[in-house]
């Protein structure tokens, strides 16, 4: 049976374009369209689609409000379309907070080298998030924004970013006894929510630097880092060339670039480079993980989270060869079980963990719990 899709956009041209692309894949079927958020909410209840594609800026009711109402009344996997502007980035992150699973730029030429690649990407994203239809999450409950430009106080409540329903803490974690000097986390589809859930649970005194590699457009990473910084007790920043890695600071790889680590453990710096056109991902998890293995050897605590494809597998292999620790997010809590599956199937990860317990496991491992 085909995956049923509801297409929501106030542009008749875009509704038609998206519908044609979706209907050209035999596994997909557009069952209806909506021209604004209010209509989308009503049709989501009545038609019960498997996936909804949603514009952000629409009359009557905007896409973010529509996502919140749909997730409250009839939770459905939602793929957002957004502009590649700073405001578009902020709105997209709001939509992910509200419960949307993934996003794509509205200008397809910005996400692919040719039309065929763009068509395939849209179709695959819809198919991937449709698999979460029977296991939908609730929207993120965000804490109130800080009233000043300073980072929130350590006593501030962390945002319980959504994922799998919380599991009972039946397993008591034990530290391995290894010593670490760096934490490295790589992710793609579903990563913004996953990273928010993990990072908001880390204390200000987290004992070493954190490098974050999230597949994301260049215009989105600054907005994402800024948002995380307002929500987290640790400092979060978009990485810049020459940054000296400091304990308790998370460095988000800038979109459209590669992030590498240079120097020696304890005095390492970041190099931000273009990386050429040979790499499929910018930023690429393999690139950062590989450089971390060379600089830190067996002193890296690394994680591969939800995401499509296999980026991170080869970098994780290098980390394991150097003696470092690699964990993977488990299938049930992933939006897309691609990157973690690649690591787990290759026998590289030592533990497969549910998202809602990764932060707890990290704190035990580094001696803070």
UniProtKB/Swiss-Prot annotation:
Domain of life per record: Bacteria
- Domain annotation CheB-type methylesterase: ranges: 176-369
Please list the reactions this protein catalyses: [protein]-L-glutamate 5-O-methyl ester + H2O = L-glutamyl-[protein] + methanol + H(+); L-glutaminyl-[protein] + H2O = L-glutamyl-[protein] + NH4(+)
Q: Which residues form the active site?
A: 188, 215, 311
Entry-annotated residues carrying 4-aspartylphosphate: 55
Q: Its Enzyme Commission number?
A: 3.1.1.61, 3.5.1.44
Q: Which GO terms describe its molecular function?
A: phosphorelay response regulator activity; protein-glutamate methylesterase activity; protein-glutamine glutaminase activity
Record PTM text: Phosphorylated by CheA. Phosphorylation of the N-terminal regulatory domain activates the methylesterase activity.
Protein's cellular compartments: Cytoplasm
Q: Which GO terms describe its cellular component?
A: cytoplasm
Name the principal localization, coarsely classed. Answer: cytoplasm
User: Region Disordered: which residues?
Assistant: 146-175
Sorted alphabetically, the Gene Ontology BP terms of this entry are: chemotaxis
UniProt cross-references to InterPro entries, sorted A to Z: CheB-like, CheB_C, CheY-like_superfamily, Sig_transdc_resp-reg_Me-estase, Sig_transdc_resp-reg_receiver
Composition skew (Low complexity), residue ranges: 146-171
Q: Note whether Phosphoprotein occurs among the keywords.
A: yes
Write one Pfam family the protein is assigned to. CheB_methylest
**Record's comment describing the protein's domains:** Contains a C-terminal catalytic domain, and an N-terminal region which modulates catalytic activity.
Membership in a protein family: Belongs to the CheB family.
- Role played: Involved in chemotaxis. Part of a chemotaxis signal transduction system that modulates chemotaxis in response to various stimuli. Catalyzes the demethylation of specific methylglutamate residues introduced into the chemoreceptors (methyl-accepting chemotaxis proteins or MCP) by CheR. Also mediates the irreversible deamidation of specific glutamine residues to glutamic acid.
Q: Which NCBIfam families match?
A: PRK00742.1 (NF001965)
Q: Supply the name of the protein.
A: Protein-glutamate methylesterase/protein-glutamine glutaminase
């Amino acid at each position: 049976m085909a995956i049923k899709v509801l297409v929501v956009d106030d542009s008749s041209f875009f509704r038609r374009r998206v519908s044609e692309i979706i209907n050209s894949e035999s596994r997909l079927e557009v069952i209806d369209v909506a021209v604004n958020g209010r209509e989308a909410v009503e049709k989501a209840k009545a038609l019960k689609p498997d996936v909804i594609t949603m514009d952000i800026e629409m009359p009557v009711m905007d896409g973010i409000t529509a996502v919140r109402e749909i997730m409250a009344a009839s939770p459905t996997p939602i793929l957002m379309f957004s502009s590649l502007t700073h405001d578009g980035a902020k709105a997209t992150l709001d939509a992910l907070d509200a419960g949307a699973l993934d996003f794509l730029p509205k200008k397809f030429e910005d996400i692919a080298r040719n039309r065929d690649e763009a068509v395939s990407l849209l179709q695959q994203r819809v198919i991937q998030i449709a698999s979460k239809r029977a296991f939908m999450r609730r929207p993120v409950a965000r804490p109130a924004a800080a009233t000043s430009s300073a980072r929130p106080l350590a006593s501030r409540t962390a945002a319980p970013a959504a994922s799998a329903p919380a599991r009972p803490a039946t397993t008591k974690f034990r530290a391995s006894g290894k010593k670490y000097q760096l934490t490295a986390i790589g992710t793609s589809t579903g990563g913004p929510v996953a990273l928010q859930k993990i990072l908001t649970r880390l204390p200000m005194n987290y004992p070493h630097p954190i490098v974050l590699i999230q597949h994301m457009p260049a215009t989105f990473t600054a907005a994402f880092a800024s948002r995380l910084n307002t929500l987290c007790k640790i400092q979060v920043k978009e990485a810049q060339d020459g940054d000296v890695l400091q304990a308790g600071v998370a460095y988000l790889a800038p979109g459209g670039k590669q992030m590498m680590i240079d120097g020696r453990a304890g005095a390492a710096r970041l190099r931000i480079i273009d990386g050429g056109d040979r790499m499929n991902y910018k930023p690429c998890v393999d690139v950062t993980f590989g450089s971390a293995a060379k600089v830190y050897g067996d002193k890296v605590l690394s994680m591969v989270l939800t995401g499509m494809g296999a980026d991170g597998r080869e970098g994780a292999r290098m980390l394991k060869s150097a003696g470092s620790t690699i964990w993977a997010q488990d299938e049930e809590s992933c939006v897309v079980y691609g990157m973690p599956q690649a690591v787990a199937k290759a026998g590289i990860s030592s533990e497969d963990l549910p998202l809602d317990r990764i932060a707890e496991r990290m704190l035990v491992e580094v001696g803070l719990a």
